Amino acid sequence: MKKLVLIMVGLFLLTTANAQDKAALKAQKAAKKAAEKTLKEVRNIYEMSIPNPQYGRKETNFDKLETALPLVQTITESEYTKDNPQAWKLATDIQIQYFTKIENESKADPDNEEIKKKYIDSSSKLLNYCIKYDSLLALDTKVKPEEKVKEHKTYQTRGVNAAVPLLQAAQNYSNSDKQDELKLGVLYAEQFIATMDKSGLMKDFTHQELAGWKTYAKAFRAQAYLDIKGTPEDKIVSSYEELFDSNFKGIAYQSLSNYYRETDKAKQNKYLQAGIEALKDDAEQKDLRANFVTILMQNQFQGGDVEGFKKTAEIMKTEYADNDNTVNAYLMEGQIAFEAKDYDTAKNIFLAGNEKYPDEPKCLLMAARSAWMKAQANGSKKPDMEEAIKLFKQIEAANPNDPELWGESLYVLYNNTQQPKLAANYKKYYKATK
């Protein structure tokens, strides 16, 4: 009896399971049928909304087409139609109508910010639809190869037309002073880059400006990242390093140099040095390279990197002799020798600087002071003192209205060389309190 009960229970469970399976299968069939019906409904709405001379429609009926929008969301999300290429083709074709409409509105009113945002949103959505349709079409075995090629080219063109406004938006937003807009700059730049580099839609796209477009997008992204508060260091660095092989390399090295200016001199110098090397043969960025050399030279001088400084200063002196900052190479190099108490070398460096840049009084002044220090170090021998006097007299001749450069020094030097009559001419400049 117990065995019979168990058999009856087993049969009951099997019957219940079969009933549930049948109910589930029936529900699935109903859902699939409903999804396919929705797909047909969307197609009918689309075809009855777009211009068609046969039915006397010269323009798109957007009031009618709008009724398809919630249905488009249904067919692109339903598990029964979301992998159907035709669902995404319809979504794309409908979006093209709105994209074209908003594009025309944007051209008619280019300063309208609300229309601009709608245009960019429409562009982004259209591009995503084109990519999705193209990817599903490639897997559809029912479509002939030649038809696939034709469709691919058609929707590739539409995708490009949608991508270009995203590049323009990335440029605009990356120059904003608003954090939310800077983030949009990154978003649209990355969408453009990913589309061109990774999507099947663009795998065979060729255009003479394509490489330039991608470089611009990367530059806009880097600029936005730099200005967004809290952007991780690695994102900023990597985004600019991607530009090292482009025509934006100068800006990239400059931006990274500035990024580390206050926080890490070693890293700043690293990018300055790399920038100097990268721009070595770039005539168009000669001034920027000279700026790199100037900053690196100053950093090395202030940081005590004497050997590094000398190499950089040599670049400045030999390659940028006409640059206003080159005189500093002589002044700093002379200062290094002066502080090392190599006064003769210091004097010669300062004199070389004075010969090339006579309008900079510091060169001759430091040469004179070096000569005086040499004299003091050698026991104040008269020939050495006379050399210092000669240089201070040159300063007086060149700067007669600036006695603070030479007056007191000549008074002391003449006194120390037992020339009281000459010293008397400069006594008025002597500060007895010193």
Give the positions of each predicted feature.
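Single-residue signature of alpha-solenoid repeat helices
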Residues: 68, 123-126, 185, 236, ...
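Canonical positions in the second alpha-helix
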Residues: 75, 133, 192, 242-243, ...
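Hydrophobic/aromatic packing residues within the alpha-helices of TPR/SEL1-like helical repeat arrays
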Residues: 65, 72, 127-130, 189, ...
